[in-house]
Each structure stands twice: as C-alpha cells, then as structure tokens.
UniProtKB/Swiss-Prot annotation:
Protein name per Swiss-Prot or TrEMBL: Adaptation to cold protein C
Keyword Glycoprotein: no
UniProt keyword annotations, A-Z: Stress response
Induction info: Part of the atcJABC operon. The operon is constitutively expressed, and expression shows only a very slight increase at low temperature.
Species of the source: Shewanella oneidensis (strain ATCC 700550 / JCM 31522 / CIP 106686 / LMG 19005 / NCIMB 14063 / MR-1)
Complex and partners: Interacts with the C-terminal extension of AtcJ. Also interacts with AtcB, but not with AtcA.
UniProt gene name: atcC
Regulation of this protein's activity per its record: Interaction with AtcJ stabilizes AtcC.
Disruption phenotype: Deletion of the gene leads to a dramatically reduced growth at low temperature.
Chain's role: Involved in cold adaptation.
C-alpha cells in the first residue's frame, strides 16, 4: 500500500493526518512504517475476505477500501482533530480501531439498503463502500459526505419505522416504497382525527361515510394541536427530530386534505361509483393531498 504524504486539503483524512504529522515532525519514520504495515495487513485481510488477494488490481482495491474506511472511523474517533487523530494512529491498535469504527458506521447506515438485497461486502452496501473507497493521493475525497447522506437517509427510515410502529396497524413496510416522512405522519394525524386516535388501517375511504366531520377540525390551530399530540406519543428526541423536519406548509396542506375528505364523503353518501371517486381523487391531484391514502378501493 502506498500512502502518499502531501498537503491535500480535500484528500482522504488518513493521508491528511499523516502528511501533517510528517510536516510538524510529530510522526517519525518508524511510526509511519508501523502504520503502513498495519494498513497493508488490514488490506490483505479485506482482500482475502471479499476479493482475490492474488490479483494485484483487487489487492489495490482493498487498499483503497481500507484507506477510506480508516479515514471515516478516524474522523469520528478524533472529532476531526488531526493532532488527536495522529495520537490514535500511533497506538498499537489505532489503525484497527479506526477501521472497525468506520466499518461499523457504514454497516449501520446500510441496513435499510440491504433489506431486499445482498452485498458483496456482507452488511455494508456495495455502492456506499465504493463512494468511501479512495486512493491515498486523491485530490478530493467525498467519502465522508457520502456517509453523511447515507446517515440522513438511515435516520429518515428510522423515523418512518417509529411512526409506523406507533400509529399504524401494519407496522412493517418496504424501504423501496420510498415513503415520505411528512406523508406518513400526515396520514396518521388525519386518520386519528377522523377515527378517535385509532391506528391507521387501509379503510379510511370506506369508513369516512359513517362518521360526522366536526366543524372544529377545520382550522390550522386544531390540526397543529393534533400533530403535537401525536408527536408527544413518540420518544422526545425522535419527536423533536421529526418536528424540525416538518415544513411550514404541513398544517395548511393537511387542512386542504381535510376539505377534500369532506367532498369525498359527500360523493360516497350520494352513492358515487368507484370510478367517479377515483376520477375525483386524480382531479384534485393525489400528490398534493398530504396525508390522503394512496391505496385503491376495489
């Protein structure tokens, strides 16, 4: 493995730390050799597990994977402080700890990506590892940004799962459905409003004809109150995260959907055909009806 030491502001964090250590005379030649030796050993182990270690280009790929994963773990363990990072690297198991941390980070954010598929790299998504992997002398390393994007998506999936578990009768879902966090919460708030805080089922379009819509529901204040009431049933940290993620148009959009629900109910009471109801939905624009269920009534 070649670890090129030069001043690269945007390169892999591992290379940046080693270059600074050399420049500041805080990293000796012997210490550098030990770090490189441990990184090479890590590359051989990775190649033996996932690649063909006897093919030079695959061994090189494993080395790039190690540099990226170690850089990621090193950033996390050192809080991106290069002096602290160097002190960690020169410890006996510093490189191993950084790799294990980086791999663990990638594994966590890969979970939802691997629900319906398998990865060459076990519990780490192949595409994500490819984004993190880097040669040591890369002018630009976007591995940390790729991880951050994956982390945001992972947290979004966790939030959706928590909403489903708390407010839906059917708690499992396929991440490939690309559910929208706002829509999942909005459907729960709407359903709870209509059916006395019941868990969401795929029966709103049939049941709505059997209830009376209260005048007090048709106000932004009431909808905001119902939204906060729902969020209060979630763990505080999660509720705060979801609340901050909601757009300013959440309550107005849900109020529009409630007015639509009133018109839909009137059509039901007038024995409108399923085809007419479906046309009415599409005329209003299903995408613009926040919280309105998308399933088809047969």
């Amino acid at each position: 493995m070649q670890l090129v030491l030069r001043d690269i502001d945007q390169g892999p964090f591992l290379s940046k730390v080693l270059a600074k250590g050399q420049a500041d005379d805080t990293l000796s030649g012997e210490q550098l050799a030990q770090i490189k030796s441990k990184a090479i050993l890590m590359s051989l182990k990775l190649a033996d597990k996932f690649y063909n270690k006897y093919k030079m280009h695959l061994l090189e790929q494993a080395a790039h994977d190690v540099i990226g994963v170690v850089s990621l773990g090193l950033m996390e363990l050192s809080n991106q402080d290069q002096q602290q990072a160097l002190r960690l690297l020169i410890t006996a198991d510093g490189v191993v700890k950084c790799f294990q941390k980086g791999w663990s980070m990638l594994s966590v954010v890969s979970k939802h990506k691997l629900v319906n598929s398998k990865s060459l790299y076990g519990d780490v998504d192949k595409f994500l590892l490819e984004q993190v992997s880097t040669p040591p002398d890369a002018d630009e390393w976007l591995g940390y940004e790729a991880y951050q994007d994956a982390l945001v998506e992972h947290q979004r999936q966790q939030s959706i799962a928590a909403l489903m578990a708390q407010f839906y009768a059917q708690t499992s879902y396929d991440p490939l459905d690309f559910l929208n966090l706002e829509s999942v919460l909005a459907e729960a708030v709407l359903y709870r409003m209509l059916f006395d805080n019941a868990k969401v089922r795929q029966d709103l379009k049939k049941r709505i004809a059997k209830i009376s819509l209260q005048d007090e529901w048709f106000s932004l204040e009431y909808i905001e109150q119902q939204t906060q009431q729902a969020l209060a049933e979630l763990p505080a940290e999660l509720a705060d995260t979801i609340g901050k993620d909601l757009g300013k148009n959440f309550a107005p959009a849900l109020l529009r959907t409630l007015h639509f629900a009133k018109s839909y109910r009137e059509l039901l009471l007038n024995d409108a055909s399923p085809e007419r109801l479906e046309r009415f939905e599409h005329k209003e624009g299903l995408v613009g009806l926040l919280g309105w269920p998308l399933y088809i009534v047969l």
